[in-house]
Amino acid sequence: MIIVDRISEMQALMRQYHREGKTIGFVPTMGYLHEGHAALIDRARQENDIVVLSVFVNPLQFGPNEDFARYPRDFERDRHIAEQHGVDVLFHPEAGEMYPGPLTVQVVVKARTDVLCGRSRPGHFDGVATVLTKLFHIVMPDRAYFGLKDAQQVAVVDGLIRDFNFPIELVPVPTVREADGLAKSSRNVYLSPQEREEAPALYQALRAAAAAVDGGERSADAIRRLVKEHIEAHTHAEIDYVEVCSYPDLAPLETLHGTVLVAVAVRFASARLIDNIILELPKAHRQED
């Protein structure tokens, strides 16, 4: 495995791979890798000649009161996991390499950001889109892999790739979960023992929503109520949002139809967790993510 921390070196290496006719799969991360990231790497490994993993905690996507300083970091652990899962190139730039001075140009996301996490995190997806635009130009991948746990991010990346004509295939990968259903997340380490015990209620609520839809429920209000009441009954968390919207456009719905995202975010004392489920209507089939 090659470890690179300079943009110029990374671009030269990627050009070499392209000259050799090799396909490149890219997994962008902020590090502190877990089984969810490993699933992205494994999928990329199956589908490409070269797998590139980036580990970069992007300051642009953290708000003024968010956890940039305390976001978990352990590069040696990340390096070991990357090597175990067959990563060819690990790109690990410092913030000063990615942002050597004040930005002259920044990507501003105009749609799909006024709901879900975007509503309470102004500027977050602008930061995500800006760093991904830079990374896509640096890595020049054929495919980019993202976890559906952050379905809004996947929707934003879908728009970024389409609107900026990046020659990249977006590959969404289903959420990896603990045995009790809790979505894998780097932020799970912040949970207290009691919060960790309560946290699977998020996915239980989403599964209850899916069961209600399978049973014929089509009211978005009814689904929101069901999810909210389940979480309130089984956790001490503060609910940030429960949303029912179209996917990937993230338009609000009154009546469920087409591809529907049911998404939830809650705040425990020291961690904010998100989860979602994607439903395909009118068929009873559903894709759990």
Swiss-Prot record:
GO terms for biological process: pantothenate biosynthetic process. It catalyses: (R)-pantoate + beta-alanine + ATP = (R)-pantothenate + AMP + diphosphate + H(+). Signal peptide: none annotated. The keyword Cytoplasm applies. (R)-pantoate binds at Q61, Q153. Catalyzes the condensation of pantoate with beta-alanine in an ATP-dependent reaction via a pantoyl-adenylate intermediate. Belongs to the pantothenate synthetase family. This is Pantothenate synthetase.
